[in-house]
Amino acid sequence: MRLVFAGTPEFARIALDALLAAGHDVPLVLTQPDRPAGRGLKLTPSPVKQAALAAGIEVAQPRSLRLDGRYPDEAAAARAQLERVAPDVMVVAAYGLILPQWTLDLPRLGCLNIHASLLPRWRGAAPIQRAIEAGDAETGVTIMQMDAGLDTGDMLLERAVPIGAQQTAAQLHDELALAGGQAIVDALAALGQGGLAPRRQPDAGVTYAAKLDKAEAALDCSLPAAVLARRVRAFNPVPGATIRLPGLDDPVKVWRAQALEQAAGGPPGAVLRADAQGIDIATGQGVLRLLELQKAGGKRQPVDVFVRGWQP
């Protein structure tokens, strides 16, 4: 099947690799423009662009696909490239640009999206993090026929993935990326044989995964410890949960924490204990034990190392 692939981060790169390994013809890739990265803020290509160039695939990087937007010339050039390629399907995975109607209509079989949740739960920008934050027992990937709405299109295939009790967003991301790559390969194989029946998303159970905000990173110790522990996992590695500790001017990043089912024994935010076993923080309900931390400008440290250089 002749495909155009549109995606940007590592999640999408894994899907592109899976499509190429399955033997699909991918003559064109769309990805976001190169961005400054690292301490030197050097312009860096996306993981998808790097993979495409390594495979000898043509790459387009329009800043917008809207013909009536801020970059109409770039959108028109991308449209000309797509029309020349004449794809059967466009596969979209974490691309980062809104697809206007002309884009949805151009491929013979439309545009298929790899979404990192079991729709209609967690439509939107941050489904992996929000699933962990909410305490969901499972999530998954959905292959969806794209329409003009926000993750509202008909579902073609779903694959459920359990969420581990201590699993971080980074770990779940990697698992879902692999599941998504296999799911899109399976979906295209079934689609080519006429074996996929689109299913309308149910009206019940719709939730939205709002984009992550840096302000959310600061742990509010008036919340229950269980909620805070989930946020530590959900925000690992980005934006990274933080907490303020006495004696330190800057917030400390929390990489790993555990909720203890015991009485707080102090006002929210109070340090109840600090030793090699952990730093116990009183919360609105229960105790949050900090297990791995990082001072501003420092390195990640297990708590037994951290406490040797800090006293409350």
UniProtKB/Swiss-Prot annotation:
Keywords in alphabetical order: Protein biosynthesis, Transferase
Catalytic activity: L-methionyl-tRNA(fMet) + (6R)-10-formyltetrahydrofolate = N-formyl-L-methionyl-tRNA(fMet) + (6S)-5,6,7,8-tetrahydrofolate + H(+)
Cysteine pairs bridged by disulfides in the record: none
One example GO MF annotation: methionyl-tRNA formyltransferase activity
Name of the molecule in the record: Methionyl-tRNA formyltransferase
SUPFAM superfamilies (alphabetical): FMT C-terminal domain-like, Formyltransferase
Name of the top EC class for this enzyme: transferase
GO CC terms: cytosol
Pfam families (UniProt xref): Formyl_trans_C (PF02911), Formyl_trans_N (PF00551)
InterPro entries according to UniProt: Fmt, Formyl_trans_C, Formyl_trans_C_sf, Formyl_transf_N, Formyl_transf_N_sf, Formyl_transferase-like_C_sf, GART_AS, Met-tRNA-FMT_C
Family: Belongs to the Fmt family.
Function: Attaches a formyl group to the free amino group of methionyl-tRNA(fMet). The formyl group appears to play a dual role in the initiator identity of N-formylmethionyl-tRNA by promoting its recognition by IF2 and preventing the misappropriation of this tRNA by the elongation apparatus.
Residue sites binding (6S)-5,6,7,8-tetrahydrofolate per the record: S117, L118, L119, P120
UniProt-listed Enzyme Commission number(s): 2.1.2.9
Gene this chain is encoded by: fmt
